Curated annotation (Swiss-Prot):
Region called Viral RNA-binding, residue ranges: 31-104
Species this chain originates from: Enterobacteria phage JP34 (Bacteriophage JP34)
Protein name, as recorded: Capsid protein
Single biological process term from Gene Ontology: regulation of translation
Top-level lineage group: Viruses
């Protein structure tokens, strides 16, 4: 069983990294937040459910805020202008070995690796072209 612990969500090489810390584990849903106020925080939730007798289902959700500065009475305050949302449902057969699941985890990381088509489309706010 995975332990709830802090982890680096956005790795910027040590400068401006975003670390999220566990804040809740209620009703089977684990939640992590960055150190900002809730409205300005990066947020990750993850849950695990049995899906039939032979499958495990993981649901991972991510919120990424766009932080801007707003001036109120001459004081600059950080506020969230908007948030981007992601949701991933992952269903794994119960008989998958540790090596199989490691490959699945690496595949998920590879989907969004800089330079891959999915990451490029997201970065350029475009679709997919031949």
């Amino acid at each position: 069983m995975a332990t709830l612990r802090s982890f680096v969500l956005v790795d910027n090489g040590g400068t401006g990294d975003v670390t999220v810390v566990p804040v809740s584990n209620a009703n089977g849903v684990a939640e992590w937040l960055s150190n900002n106020s809730r409205s300005q925080a990066y947020r990750v939730t993850a849950s695990y459910r049995a899906s039939g007798a032979d499958k495990r289902k993981y649901t991972i959700k991510l919120e990424v805020p766009k932080i801007v500065t707003q001036v109120v009475n001459g004081v600059e305050l950080p506020v969230s202008a908007w948030k981007a949302y992601a949701s991933i449902d992952l269903t794994i057969p119960i008989f998958a070995a540790t090596d199989d699941v490691t490959v699945i985890s690496k595949s998920l990381a590879g989907l969004f690796k800089v330079g891959n088509p999915i990451a490029d489309a997201i970065s350029s706010q475009s679709g997919f072209y031949a």
